[in-house]
Amino acid sequence: MPTIQQLVRKGRRPKVNKTKSPALRGNPQQRGVCSRVYTTTPKKPNSALRKVARVKLSNGTEVTVYIPGEGHNLQEHSIVLVRGGRVKDLPGVRYKVVRGALDAQAVKDRKQARSRYGAKMEKK
C-alpha cells in the first residue's frame, strides 16, 4: 500500500481497457476488400470447414474475418463490411462479415435470427 507522500508524488494510474477489436479503431464497422477467401479447420474438440477471408480494411490493416451463415458469394476483390466479434474455435479470427451489406449477400431461406444474416422477411 502506498504512503500518502507516494500518492502525492505519483497519484493513481487509471486502468486502461484493451479493445477486443483493435483494427476497427473504435468504429462499429469498417469497409474492406477481400484479398483471399478460404476455409480453415477449428480448434480441437470441433471439426468443420469454417469459411474465412483475409480482408484489407480501408484504414490499411489486414485482418482475418469469419463469414457467418450457410453459403456465401464472396471472392477475391469483393467489398465487405466488417464488424467485431470473435469466433471461439478459430484462433486469430476476431472479426465477422456483415451479411446483406455491400457485396456480401444475405443468407438464403433464413427463417430465424434473420437480422444477423441480412435476410428479408418472407412474403406470405
Swiss-Prot record:
ATP-binding: is it a keyword of this entry?
no
What is the recorded name of this protein? Small ribosomal subunit protein uS12
Q: Which SUPFAM superfamilies match?
A: Nucleic acid-binding proteins (SSF50249)
Which residue ranges are recorded for the region named Disordered?
A: 1-42
Q: Name one GO biological process term.
A: translation
- Keyword tRNA-binding recorded: yes
Q: Which GO terms describe its cellular component?
A: small ribosomal subunit
Disulfide bond sites = none
Subunit-structure text: Part of the 30S ribosomal subunit. Contacts proteins S8 and S17. May interact with IF1 in the 30S initiation complex.
HAMAP family given in the database record: Ribosomal_uS12_B
Q: What keywords does the record list, in alphabetical order?
A: Methylation, Ribonucleoprotein, Ribosomal protein, RNA-binding, rRNA-binding, tRNA-binding
Biological classification of the source: Bacteria, Bacillati, Actinomycetota, Actinomycetes, Micrococcales
For this protein, the record's Pfam families field holds: Ribosom_S12_S23 (PF00164)
Which family is it part of?
Belongs to the universal ribosomal protein uS12 family.
Per UniProt, the ranges with Polar residues bias are 27-42
Where does this protein have compositionally biased stretches of type Basic residues? 9-18
Q: Which gene encodes it?
A: rpsL
Which function does this protein serve? With S4 and S5 plays an important role in translational accuracy. Interacts with and stabilizes bases of the 16S rRNA that are involved in tRNA selection in the A site and with the mRNA backbone. Located at the interface of the 30S and 50S subunits, it traverses the body of the 30S subunit contacting proteins on the other side and probably holding the rRNA structure together. The combined cluster of proteins S8, S12 and S17 appears to hold together the shoulder and platform of the 30S subunit.
